Amino acid sequence: MGGKIRSWHKLFPTFTPADEVLSAMRHRLSQSENITIRTDCKATNISPRCVTLSTGEELQCDAVVVATGSTLFDARIKEEYGYGIYDNVITSADLEQMFNKGEVRLTTGAQPRRIAILHCVGSRDEKVCQRHCSKVCCVTGVKQAIELKQLFPAADVFNFYMDIRMFGPGYEEMYREAQQKYNVHFVRGRISEVSPTIDNRLQIKAEDTLTGRPLKLGVDMLVLLIGMRSNDMNISLEQAGLKRQPSGFMQPKDSFLGNVESNISGIFYAGTITAPKNVGESINEATAAARKVTEWLNKR
């Protein structure tokens, strides 16, 4: 219970430990009445009046909130980056796990001295049919770069990006802090090739599009900022009559006045089931969905 936040170490832009947020939410849940938690099962069929679980049990209901979220892009699809092929090519999700364990190390056990972070892996990429922006990757890359510099002050950290999209409160300030306080390097350009070297490092090729110059860089570790992709369960939701966007995310009833409502009365949405969002936005949507459910029940 807790969704994707369980795998995070600290949350941007305040660097609040994810465990603190989860603990506070679980405490509030434990103090609430008339709530039954079912784990180790999933919904196999959803309608406004009945939810069928994988255990075979049917739950009768008057409203349903679907908050099945999103999943992460499989970095192995982008073979040119070497994930699953070369040592020390990891994803942003892998790095969060390392932060949680307190062990950010190379496969040899040594500390990384030079680290590259690549933005937009599986986002804004027509070649892999992921045209959407995953929204939180840029700020995640900045947050992780700062955490790496806090762990290894002498290390060189490079962020390779197409565009830096700092949309939230405190994000732009964190981006500036990464450059001014932590001396994180930002290079505008995508990495075109990754290859191993004879001394067990990684050589990356890219182009600095601001200077128009090709770039070769030897690094100890490459972090791939993987984007959000729609949950595979959305296909079965579409088969049940719910509308799905071309991106694979579910289509809300209205982007402005019904963003937590579906096209079927009595079924509501919350979180990244409809689009990439940060933690705060997902929590706010859950609150909005709860209010909409209350309104719906009071009308019946």
Language model segments and positions:
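Residues forming the flavin
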Residues: 1-300
